[in-house]
Swiss-Prot record:
Biological process (GO), any one: negative regulation of DNA-templated transcription
One GO MF term attached to the UniProt entry: DNA binding
Classification of source organism: Bacteria, Bacillati, Bacillota, Bacilli, Lactobacillales
Oligomeric form and interacting partners: Homodimer.
Signal sequence region: none
Keyword NADP among record annotations: no
Gene: purR
Similarity remark: Belongs to the purine/pyrimidine phosphoribosyltransferase family. PurR subfamily.
Region (Effector binding domain): 74-275
Any one Pfam family match given in the protein's UniProt record, by short name: PuR_N
Name of the protein described by the UniProt record: Probable purine biosynthesis transcriptional regulator PurR
Gene3D superfamilies with a match to the protein in the record: 3.40.50.2020, Winged helix-like DNA-binding domain superfamily/Winged helix DNA-binding domain
């Protein structure tokens, strides 16, 4: 398919954005668009400059016989902070308080545009880490983990609290649940879900006592895999927990006043490295 340079640059840009973290040979573009490799190389230089100027992401050129280009998506710090501030405002709405002091998050974590932006923000925060998979526990964390995995272009695995025959052989661990740590529960992961030696990013919607995350970390050990990091949408800072793992949060809930129907929410520690 022979294209004019302007058209060719559009389709190459679209390809890179939709195939992040994937090494693509320049020959692939040259053959597909019937252009000289030198012309494709010039296209990449222009696209790279534009992407970096508007902070869409970075293009890395890999030299050698097996070389090519790799696109790493990003988001500007200003855009990310504005998005998180908007989420903070939404989460502070008093009508989100549910019986028992829980917070309604489903509308936020089921909106594609919001999920896409959260995925970009979390992925950027871990862009220097080698990540092979994203892990979460069913069910509320699934859309969030999927969004992050899409940006990182890696698989995501779902840990379940109940055994399903469709999962095949599974590995299970016991974990402490409940804010007071007074319940022992079990979680399961299919043996086919995760390869040994994988570096895994754990993603969850809401961090309370930390028992669920600790359970997933225990599962990683059973699979001879390594924890690459923990990211949560919101952290309940009211909960007392023994710090057994580091994590990054977009939002931090500092107070839930059920009686007066008030929620105090701050921006989490996701941007601490920018300070």
């Amino acid at each position: 398919m022979k294209l004019r340079r302007s058209d060719r640059m559009v389709v190459i840009s679209n390809y890179l954005i939709n195939n992040p973290y994937k090494l693509t040979s320049l020959n692939t573009f040259a053959e597909k668009y019937e252009s000289a490799k030198s012309s494709i190389s010039e296209d990449i230089v222009i696209i790279k400059r534009a992407f970096e100027e508007i902070e869409i992401g970075h293009i890395q050129t890999v030299t050698g016989a097996g070389g090519g280009v790799i696109f790493t998506p990003s988001i500007s710090s200003q855009d990310a902070k504005e998005m998180v501030e908007d989420l903070r405002t939404k989460l502070s709405e008093s009508d989100r308080i549910l019986p028992g002091g829980y917070i309604y998050l489903s509308d936020l974590l089921s909106t594609p545009a919001i999920l896409k932006n959260i995925g970009r923000i979390i992925a950027k925060s871990f862009m220097d880490q080698k990540i092979d998979a994203v892990m979460t526990v069913a069910t509320k964390g699934v859309p969030l983990a999927n969004a992050v995995a899409n940006v990182l272009n890696v698989s995501f695995v779902i840990v379940r609290r109940d055994l399903k025959i469709t999962e095949g052989s599974t590995v299970s661990v016991n974990y402490v649940s409940g804010s007071s740590g007074d319940r022992i529960e079990k979680m399961f992961l299919s043996k086919r879900s995760l390869k040994a030696g994988s570096r895994v990013l754990i993603v969850d919607d809401f961090l309370k006592g930390g028992g669920t995350v600790n359970g997933m970390i225990s599962l990683l050990r059973e699979f001879d895999s390594e924890l690459a990091g923990v990211a949560v949408f919101a952290d309940n800072a009211q909960e007392e927990r023994e710090k057994q793992f580091d994590y990054k949060s977009l939002l931090k809930v500092t107070n839930i006043d059920v009686k007066n129907q008030a929620i105090d929410v701050e921006v989490g520690n996701i941007f601490d490295e920018d300070k």
